Amino acid sequence: LQWLPQTSKNRRSALFVLGGSVRFLVWGECAAPAIYNEDSVERLMREWTEIIARDFSHPSIVTWVPINESWGVPKISFDRTQQHFSQAMYHFLHALDKTRLVISNDGWAMTETDICAIHNYAHGQKEETEKYDYFKETLRTRENLIKRLSTPWPIFANGFSYQEQPILLTEFGGIGFDVSGQPGWGYTSVDNEVEFLKDYQRVLSAVYASVGLWGYCYTQLTDVEQEINGLLTYDRQPKVDLAAIKAINDQFHVSQVE
């Protein structure tokens, strides 16, 4: 399973139409509020009502993600009020749309959720072998994915626990590679195409060594304003030979299917 979250501004996008025509799976997200208060709660509930009314008929959308990485709910790990809001959004979206999955807080500190969605960028530079070994170990089994943390935050918020949901690595990679002089950053960095492809294969090797993961989403398809970790530049030009990327993907994926 591979898919692409639709992030940033919510607008009717050709991505949804394209996804439907090429059988590409898309997750519906929206921009997060800067802070948590009653106004942000009301605004987000209203915006999600509009989002689902607008995008419900797109078959490419398979999951709704109202919260990502605790943005807008910074105390969700321990604050019961913010946890209530996360749970309310989970049930609210299910009430509006019974056909799709809902993730309560993509990345970590989840409450009620249909997918256990984990973010892990802790693979390190190629020379950081101990860091890479730990990264690989955190992914190796279902138990490790839940208990061996790669961030300061727990996978589930206080009072909540893993309930046998499918576990997906919904953000990883983030290999920074600048080919256009755009300022920005990545979680790790390389200097040329050869290094990028080697690092891409190194990271995917750890992912496919896991016996606990059900799927993944690589970060990310394109560079954005402040990040240079895309497979494509900001103006959608390939940074590396895309046939080489496909060959690496097929090297793992086809063997698993067969």
Language model feature labels by segment:
Residues 60-64, 84, 91, 112, ...:
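Substrate-binding clefts and catalytic carboxylate motifs of secreted carbohydrate-active enzymes
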Residues 1-127, 160-164, 195-196:
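Active-site mouth of glycoside hydrolases
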